[in-house]
A protein has these predicted regions:
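Physicochemical signature of membrane-embedded alpha-helices that form the seven-helix bundle of GPCRs
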Residues: 59-66, 86
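Extended, low-polarity transmembrane helix blocks
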Residues: 1-35, 57, 79-176
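Residue-level signal for alpha-helical context at structural boundaries
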Residues: 46-47, 66, 110
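Alpha-helix boundary/capping detector
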Residues: 41, 54, 73-75, 118-119
Length: 176
């Protein structure tokens, strides 16, 4: 009974990771490659610029490749706590920059979709990657919730500091 439960839990985690990871990777491919109606990297860089981000070229690369490579790594359960933290941050930034103030529902541009993806990333970041993961197949040591939290905090602080500098620069530009 216990063995069946563990196998079922590991399989369920893996299936959720594959589905959500591929959805996130597809969004990254839109941003990087311009496929499936996406803007491509040049168009995404313009979008990041319109969002008022400081160093828009840098953040366009970070965000798009976080989604593309991170989504694939997430699907396979590779370096899971690190990747899950990066994806959690990415979805938080998407909410803050593009969806906040538009309500909850995705149909009106709200936070529903990135919130759900971020929640799944966060849950997997604090969970053991399970038997059906590249981490386990490669014999990588369990990194645990501590690694997830450290990456989450460091990445969030980097984003907040960048945002603060961007907001301060915008104030100076408006005053000039």
């Amino acid at each position: 009974m216990v063995v069946t439960s563990v196998i079922s839990t590991d399989l369920a985690l893996a299936l959720v990771r594959v589905v959500v990871g591929l959805v996130i990777a597809a969004h990254g491919a839109q941003k990087v490659l311009g496929v499936w109606g996406g803007p491509g990297l040049a168009g995404w860089t313009q979008g990041v610029t319109r969002m008022g981000m400081r160093a828009p070229v840098f953040w366009a690369w970070v965000s798009s490749f976080s989604e593309l490579a991170g989504g694939i790594a997430f699907a396979f359960g590779f370096l899971l706590p690190v990747v899950a933290a990066a994806l959690t941050i990415q979805m938080g930034v998407a909410i803050e920059r593009a969806h906040w103030g538009k309500g909850f529902w995705n149909s009106k541009g709200g936070i529903e979709f990135p919130f759900t993806l971020g929640a799944v990333a966060a849950i997997n970041g604090i969970a053991d990657p399970g038997a059906y993961s590249l981490d386990r197949a490669l014999g990588l040591p369990a990194m645990g919730v501590g690694v997830y939290l450290v990456v989450l905090v460091v990445g969030t602080v980097a984003y907040v500091l960048s945002s603060r500098a961007s907001a301060e620069r915008a104030k100076v530009n408006r005053a000039a």
